[in-house]
Amino acid sequence: DDRGETWERLDGNGLPSGFGFALAIHPRDPDTAWVVPEEGAENRVTSDGRLGVYRTRDAGATWDVRPAYDEAWVAILREDGASDWLDPVGVYVGTQSGSIFVSPDEGETWVEAARHLPPVLSVEVAEWQ
């Protein structure tokens, strides 16, 4: 672990493509992350028309998919993923079609929390008291 000094390609190992955005990192476990793979830079739509959030718990060596929504030819931008600091960690993904998907349990299950918003260009999480 060199705090981002060096990088390696992580396509394969369970990911359907080597292109994707909406990367969210677990706030307490740097080996756990979530990403939404997309078909490529030109189309930027979810693989196979399904919104699947892929999770790694071993720093990208392997990935498993958690389906969030079927029949979702949606585009995700670079800053459209976030995680909170709760226990369990909540994970959030926004789409250019105006939906926000939320997982309250570290990516195990997903719900569409909002729809018909303007295009979501960025997702940030703040603690509300």
Q: What name fits each language-model region?
A:
Residues D1-Q129:
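Extracellular glycan-interacting surfaces
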